[in-house]
């Protein structure tokens, strides 16, 4: 048997400000640090031995994972993949969600956030928030850097990297992935065979480890959030 632990980063600065963040590299807040510490202590209480750690390229995911590893007193290397990044919100990047609801209507903003294949307008490549203009992405081929993404686009890149680098490890090891709301939703769609309607309802809380145990046939035998007080509904389980 093996384990996969999925952790959405602790609250970020732009989570607090209610802004569309996407690929912008913001840090976590004080509350986010506390969430990461609690996640680490919950994992410590489970007495788990994590064999492999993965994170996106983004600071909020890496900082969350570093705090968790410090609490676990584990010095194993973190493997970073940009494909685990948050969904790119295109021209919505940096905008306040409530202001967009007032401007476009709540239903339209909900569609942008939750629909499967709807992409927001592209983010201008001259915009300071565009990934092409951020140092952390300078080694990614420019033709692979998106201007906008749907959840389907996010799913495709996340599952491609999961299949290539992580899936085989999960068969016989305990793996922890620190990522983002939409990249974790993509993984949940794949692992739990969710349809497009189910994935639109799935909420991923910040800083709460999702514990997934597999049997020897790679079937899920157990799934739960470690922090019951902050658990969201697991619509599929």
Where are the model-predicted features located?
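Short, cationic low-complexity segments
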Residues: 229-237
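Short coil-to-beta-strand
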Residues: 2-11
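Phosphate-coordination/substrate-recognition cap region in phosphate-metabolizing enzymes
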Residues: 40-131, 137, 189-213, 236-237
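Short, well-ordered beta-to-alpha junction loops that form the rim of enzyme active sites
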Residues: 10, 55-58, 83, 114, ...
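Active-site-adjacent alpha-helix immediately C-terminal to a catalytic or transition-state-stabilizing loop
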Residues: 4, 62, 70, 145, ...
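Loop-to-helix element that buttresses phosphate recognition and phosphoryl-transfer chemistry
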Residues: 11-69, 79, 144-160, 201
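A general structural motif
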Residues: 1, 50, 75, 172-174
């Amino acid at each position: 048997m093996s384990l996969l632990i999925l952790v959405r980063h602790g609250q970020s600065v732009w989570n607090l400000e209610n802004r569309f963040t996407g690929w912008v590299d913001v840090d976590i807040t004080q509350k986010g640090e506390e969430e990461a510490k609690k996640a680490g202590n919950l994992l410590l209480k489970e007495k788990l031995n994590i064999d492999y750690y993965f994170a996106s390229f983004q600071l909020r995911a890496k900082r969350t994972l570093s705090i968790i590893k410090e609490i676990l007193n584990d010095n194993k290397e973190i493997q970073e993949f940009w494909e685990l990044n948050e969904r790119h919100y295109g021209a919505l990047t940096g905008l306040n969600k409530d202001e967009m609801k007032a401007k476009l209507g709540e239903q339209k903003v909900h569609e942008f956030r939750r629909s499967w294949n709807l992409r927001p307008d592209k983010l201008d490549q001259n915009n300071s928030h565009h990934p092409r203009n951020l140092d952390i992405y300078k080694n990614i081929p420019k033709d692979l850097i998106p201007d906008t993404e749907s959840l389907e686009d996010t799913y495709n890149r996340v599952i491609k990297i999961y299949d290539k680098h992580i899936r085989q490890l999960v068969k016989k090891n305990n793996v922890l992935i620190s990522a983002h709301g939409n990249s974790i939703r993509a993984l949940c769609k794949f692992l739990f065979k969710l349809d497009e309607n189910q994935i639109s309802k799935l909420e991923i809380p910040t800083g709460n480890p999702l514990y997934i145990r597999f049997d020897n046939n790679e079937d899920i035998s157990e799934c739960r959030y470690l922090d019951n007080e902050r658990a969201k509904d697991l619509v599929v389980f």
